[in-house]
Amino acid sequence: MSRPQFDPSAYAAQLEDKKSRLAGLLAPFAAPAPEVFESPREHYRLRAEFRLWRETGNEKRHYAMFEQGDKHTPILIEDFPIASRRINELMPRLKAAWADPALGFKLFQVEFLTTLAGDALITLCYHRPIDDAWRQAAEKLAAELGVNLVGRSRGKRIVVGRDYVEEELSVAGRRFRYRQPEGAFTQPNGEVNQKMLGWAYEALGQRDDDLLELYCGNGNFTLPLATRVRKVLATEISKSSVNAALANLADNAVDNVSLVRLSAEELTQALNEVRPFRRLADIDLKSYAFGSVFVDPPRAGMDPDTCELARRFERILYISCNPETLAQNIAQLHDTHRISRCALFDQFPYTHHMESGVLLERR
């Protein structure tokens, strides 16, 4: 993780630059002006990862980060204003615990995961085996800090408490509860994530047909969108994300979603009847009356075959973490679909990265 340049006084200008950049990328497709969803200026990031750096000639260690492309010049961190208040509160208390050799010896990396609901999990990574002595010290530390702890060393993982955090997000007046596993992808900016969910919920609208969701992750969007349609078929390839999504569906009593562990490419093959999949044995694909598809792909965007799959749907709701590949995908779809809504979500203040969303509807 590289360190963003934190400068709240520059936030408005940087956000305007992102808005102009997104509008420029979508201009060839006659897109409407993007709706803009701002981030808090500080304490917005719910995750943080630090290396540990030892001062030359003594045993004093610091949290450290590095500029992108430079892994040899550490930036020593005492506090981290872009991270959640909970992370900033935990950082010095955890640092004091390194004095215990059971916890501090050959510790090289620390990862914090927190939620808007106040939950916290810390992962400690070691260049040595961890054992029962580590567990005993970790149990004491977890109780003192009020957190869950995970220890990692080569080939070993010890969990103290839970290996996930619990989040609560509000969409259209309803609260949704989420388990967010250690090591799995979660949206880093909780406040902006909540705004994204609300935008997607509104953009989809209330439907009497079915939704296909590709790349569903832990069910972040699945839960609120499932309340807008008759039923959902959702796909995800990561095993830990699938398990979290299934737990989240159960915890929220959402019973109109079928989740399958398939890639977007595999699902395309299944829908095209190119080949059967055992993981679809209990699902009747012909029973679905799909009107919409929701996609939240990785930075590479949708591959050409998945784009062609999306073309079949009346509505394509697309959340993107890379506006360049978003524009490439829209170029492939533009002859059959037009952009009726678009949005900029400032998930990553003080960086060039941006999250965006578009609703494409059949012409």
UniProtKB/Swiss-Prot annotation:
GO cellular component: cytosol
Residue sites binding S-adenosyl-L-methionine per the record: Q187, Y215, N220, E236, D296
GO terms, biological process: tRNA methylation
UniProt keyword list: Methyltransferase, S-adenosyl-L-methionine, Transferase, tRNA processing
Key word Nucleus present: no
Source domain of life: Bacteria
Protein name as annotated: tRNA/tmRNA (uracil-C(5))-methyltransferase
